[in-house]
Design a protein with these regions (language model features):
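Metal-dependent phosphohydrolase cores
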Residues: 1-130
């Protein structure tokens, strides 16, 4: 939803960006389950964008923007830079949502209100400096 809102606000291709955002983790396996990995390129973080693209192509017709978003949403792990502004938006929204989910998990598990306060102060100082 954030991708849609941001892309719509900046008059970008919100339809393709939203569609790709919904398909970017379309890998159809439980990544929590242990599996044999022969190299670091087979680790979930590196492999799932390509698997998600393959699964998406089997089920839907995608344009170049959607393909780029799906394959490069794990940047900088994917090394290649995203080609489109919408790709960067999905990448950063994905990272933002993952961070929020992580802190919700920590808060639920450990009741870490102080962690939020220090994280807020740290991020504020970090962004104000640059």
């Amino acid at each position: 939803y954030y991708t849609y809102l941001i892309c719509k606000k900046f008059n970008l291709d919100y339809f393709s960006a939203s569609r790709a955002a919904m398909l970017h983790d379309f890998f159809l396996y439980d990544w929590h389950e242990p599996r044999k990995v022969n190299s670091f390129k087979e680790l979930h973080a590196f492999a799932h964008p390509k698997i998600a693209l393959q699964n998406s192509l089997k089920n839907f017709e995608l344009n170049d923007l959607e393909k780029d978003i799906i394959v490069k949403h794990m940047w900088p792990l994917t090394i290649k830079f995203p080609k489109y502004i919408e790709s960067y938006i999905v990448t950063f929204v994905d990272k933002y949502c993952a961070t929020v989910e992580f802190f919700k998990y920590l808060n639920k598990r450990y009741n870490l209100k102080m962690v939020y306060r220090y994280a807020y102060i740290f991020l504020t100082v970090l962004f104000v400096r640059f």
